[in-house]
């Protein structure tokens, strides 16, 4: 019913922003996989609110509790359940918004669909729902690393009109985590922070683009026709809060090229190995990974909840003016980086198991 994702490596998330807690049940993880629990917590710390001056001041520890599925930090092959308790929530900040719809937020459409909505904290539409995704994604990352030394890295490419030109082939995690905006170019990162602070002082918000790569992805992942790898990646990433666009490889810029310019020529690399001279395909051809670097980008809109006066309506359809209260990110992108990585890792882990299930007998 909309809260589960994946086929064989499957997650189901639960909880609301201002409820008792949020979490995930992960099914299908292979048994006997050694899990670094500290690495799960480290990923949640990257997503955590209150981590810097450009994120929401909501102060949550986001300490993960693993309730099942592990013994001595090894997977049992049974469902892994993880939960994070909500501590610092203030429902009174949302009293005015109980019956007033925030423009471009999920309040209005949730009310249309269900006849009721959790206005306090945004309920299931809150980014706190992604805690479960990030926790499960941390396990997916460890599985991918164990099987194929696969690495998933994302960074902030653009904030509003400020864009960084980052070489996907050379970017490293230490460069991404060297500043609070998670842009590996330190000079551009400084400008991005200044822009976020500027819009925040004005009671406004801004969006941008996150770029993500997969190094050393297993070749052969993805299935024709409706389960193409990029199709599942698009669904995964477009399910994230505030996401508004997805592209892979050359993306929309590829439409300006001719076929002779865009085609990735194959180069001799030995039997059973495909290598290309260029990578306009972004590591996926015909919906199946070819082993080259997977390169994708996700666009995120400006945060919907802002402190400026906005015209809106209430649940009775009457015109109202709303200046939202509560604690919100002026820009979601710095905290969305681990969310993007997690969803990509979950898709790859799922397709890895599906590939083994269908084709593993002959490999």
From Swiss-Prot:
Signal peptide: none annotated. PROSITE patterns: CHORISMATE_SYNTHASE_1 (PS00787), CHORISMATE_SYNTHASE_2 (PS00788), CHORISMATE_SYNTHASE_3 (PS00789). The keyword Flavoprotein applies. FMN binds at residues 124-126, 286, 301-305, 327. Its cofactor is FMNH2. GO terms for molecular function: chorismate synthase activity; FMN binding. It comes from the Bacteria. Keywords: Amino-acid biosynthesis, Aromatic amino acid biosynthesis, FAD, Flavoprotein, FMN, Lyase, NADP. GO terms for cellular component: cytosol. Its EC number is 4.2.3.5. InterPro entries: Chorismate_synth, Chorismate_synth_AroC_sf, Chorismate_synthase_CS. NADP(+) binds at residue 47. Belongs to the chorismate synthase family. Homotetramer. This is Chorismate synthase. The gene is aroC.
């Amino acid at each position: 019913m909309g809260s589960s994702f994946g086929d064989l490596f499957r997650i189901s998330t639960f909880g609301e922003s201002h409820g008792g807690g949020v979490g995930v049940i992960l099914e299908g993880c292979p048994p006997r996989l050694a899990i670094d629990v500290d690495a799960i917590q480290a990923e949640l710390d990257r997503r955590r609110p209150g981590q810097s001056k450009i994120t929401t001041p909501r102060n949550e520890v986001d300490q993960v509790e693993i309730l099942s599925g592990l013994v001595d930090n090894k997977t049992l092959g049974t469902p892994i359940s993880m939960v994070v308790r909500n501590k610092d929530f203030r429902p009174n900040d949302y009293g005015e918004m109980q019956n007033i719809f925030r423009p471009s937020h999920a309040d209005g459409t949730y009310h249309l669909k269900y006849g009721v909505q959790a206005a306090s904290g945004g309920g299931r539409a809150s980014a706190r729902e992604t805690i479960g995704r990030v926790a499960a994604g941390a396990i997916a990352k460890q599985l991918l690393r164990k099987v194929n030394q696969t690495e998933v890295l994302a960074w902030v490419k653009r904030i509003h009109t400020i864009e960084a030109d980052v070489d996907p082939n050379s970017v490293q995690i230490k460069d991404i985590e060297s500043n609070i905006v998670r842009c590996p170019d330190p000079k551009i990162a400084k400008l991005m922070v200044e822009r976020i602070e500027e819009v925040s002082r004005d009671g406004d918000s801004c969006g941008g683009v996150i770029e993500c790569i997969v190094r050393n992805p297993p070749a052969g992942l993805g299935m024709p026709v409706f389960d193409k790898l990029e199709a599942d990646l698009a669904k995964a990433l477009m399910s994230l809060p505030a996401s508004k666009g997805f592209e892979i490889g050359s993306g929309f810029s590829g439409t300006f090229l001719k076929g002779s310019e865009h085609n990735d020529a194959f180069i001799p690399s030995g039997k059973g190995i495909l290598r290309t001279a260029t990578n306009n395909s972004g590591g996926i051809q015909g919906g199946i990974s070819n082993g080259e670097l997977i390169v994708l980008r996700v666009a995120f809109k400006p945060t919907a909840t802002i402190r400026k006066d906005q015209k809106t309506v209430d649940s009775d359809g009457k015109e109202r003016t709303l200046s939202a209260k509560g604690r919100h990110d002026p820009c979601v992108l710095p905290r969305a980086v681990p969310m993007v990585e997690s969803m990509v890792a979950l898709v790859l882990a799922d397709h890895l198991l599906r590939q083994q299930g269908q084709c593993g007998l002959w490999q």
